[in-house]
Amino acid sequence: MNIFADFDTRIKNALETLDLVKENREKVDFSRITVESPRDLSHGDVATNAAMVLAKPLGTNPRALAELLVPALQADGDVDGVNVAGPGFINLKVSVGYWQRLLADMIGQGVDFGRSTVGAGQKINVEYVSANPTGPMHVGHCRGAVVGDTLANLLAFAGYGVTKEYYINDAGSQIDVLARSVFLRYREALGEDIGSIPSGLYPGDYLVPVGQALADEYGIKLRAMPEEKWLPIVKDKAIDAMMVMIREDLALLNVRHDVFFSERTLHEGNGGPILSAINDLTFKGHVYKGTLPPPKGELPDDWEDREQTLFRSTEVGDDMDRALMKSDGSYTYFAADVAYFKNKFDRGFSEMIYVLGADHGGYVKRLEAVARAVSEGKSKLTVLLCQLVKLFRDGEPVKMSKRSGDFVTLRDVVDEVGRDPVRFMMLYRKNSEPLDFDFAKVTEQSKDNPVFYVQYAHARCKSIFRQAQEAFPGLAPSAEDMAASVALISDINELQLVAKLAEYPRLIESAALSHEPHRLAFYLYDLAGSFHGHWNKGKDHQELRFINDKNRELSIARLGLVNAVANVLKSGLTLLGADAPDEMR
């Protein structure tokens, strides 16, 4: 049950009973009403702006409307009190019985508590990582991988039909460079002295096994071929090897995609899919022949002072028109982007989410223009830009590159601190804000280390169940047993913990709808703090302890509360791609 959705319905039903509303029903818009937690929890459990947004169309002032609504709200048996604050905000105090029933519902739903149908099966494509297949994942890829993967998990939990996608950039000039770099390692594997790696090729040792694999499979055959013969063979082998490496790196972060889409497929059949996309835009009136003025600053590779086939993107929100086909008939990189979006649209996605690095900020408007033109407004495009991650150790900056010139890899970071700290901390700032990652801090066993603090809360929940078995040998209450005992949960501290848990369904929906997965990390930290705080009170006040060895039934009821906390923590950590340990080791 979503307490805020529930009281949204109750408040609207109460409004419908007012004569003033009945007489002016066509003038009021209930969709503007919000129901949320009050900023000051001492004011109540639920707050609404109903009187503030409806007073003007009803020809009255907010406070007068609020006072008029109070008796109708007080008639609700689950409302213990109503007060009007300031100019007309309404705060409601929820009854103990309501919290108890809500707790029973949480216990019954288990880890599915918070699951939503708000997405109604709407198909969403989330594309993230999409690193060039030219080497291992470096630490700069971590943030986009975690943001995209967690957002996709949230959207699925909120009822959307989600596809996690990786776009393989395997058609650009960098792939030729990769193939020539691998061929050099192939020659090395055959026993040649290749000397130092020439400038412009990839120097990393990660290509040595790829060259050796080619030598094992082909012997000296490739060496005897002209470049136009061996290049496509080596390209295929190199891309396959790089994608195996990338998949393994991502698996270390618990990141797995449903679809790996190859850019090369867009160029098959002389670029048939790209031409089809251009023809589609032409049919819709978005393509013309012309020349583009030189852009300010450094000229891009695809600019030329000749007539080209252009996308009239300024008419759909872009800053300038974009070239689709050069004067020689070859396609631009942007044309492939258009074809890729059309492919997604043709697959039936109503929203496409691109998770990109901050250096792609200049692409946002052109991608949005493509979405408007191709889908004719039927499909939404959202771009999330991830700012840089800076590495620290004990507060001191860590160089992002090694002595060899290679970047610190994703594997380096996960091997040192573990998967869960990386996943959690990559979400502990909004994606649009820079993030500092301190190797020392994320391995601390303290409140200052969010992932430890949250996982420790789950482990502590499980330890309470073990303590219960020590106090009451053989005690293993079922969910039904615990739910049946919730009437014994009445202490204000316990009810405040239930109220914190009750925020979870709203949190899931808001984080999914706003595309802000960091909200989940913040919520879990707050929930862990509430739980640890209540546990600590039990050290000084025996009557607040979760296990009362003289009262079996009360202990079972409180185990139900602990169970609900554990389930929400496990649910949230799972969505984050992290473990919920039963014990901290």
Curated annotation (Swiss-Prot):
Cellular component, GO annotation: cytoplasm
Class of this enzyme: ligase
Catalysed reactions, semicolon-separated: tRNA(Arg) + L-arginine + ATP = L-arginyl-tRNA(Arg) + AMP + diphosphate
EC number: 6.1.1.19
InterPro entries: aa-tRNA-synth_I_CS, Arg-tRNA-ligase, Arg-tRNA-synth_N, Arg-tRNA-synth_N_sf, ArgRS_core, DALR_anticod-bd, Rossmann-like_a/b/a_fold, tRNAsynth_Ia_anticodon-bd
Keywords: Aminoacyl-tRNA synthetase, ATP-binding, Cytoplasm, Ligase, Nucleotide-binding, Protein biosynthesis
Pfam families: Arg_tRNA_synt_N, DALR_1, tRNA-synt_1d
Major location (coarse): cytoplasm
GO biological process: arginyl-tRNA aminoacylation
Annotated PANTHER family: ARGININE--TRNA LIGASE, CYTOPLASMIC, ARGINYL-TRNA SYNTHETASE
Assembly mode: Monomer.
Membership in a protein family: Belongs to the class-I aminoacyl-tRNA synthetase family.
Name of this chain's protein: Arginine--tRNA ligase
Organism of provenance: Agrobacterium fabrum (strain C58 / ATCC 33970)
Gene designation: argS
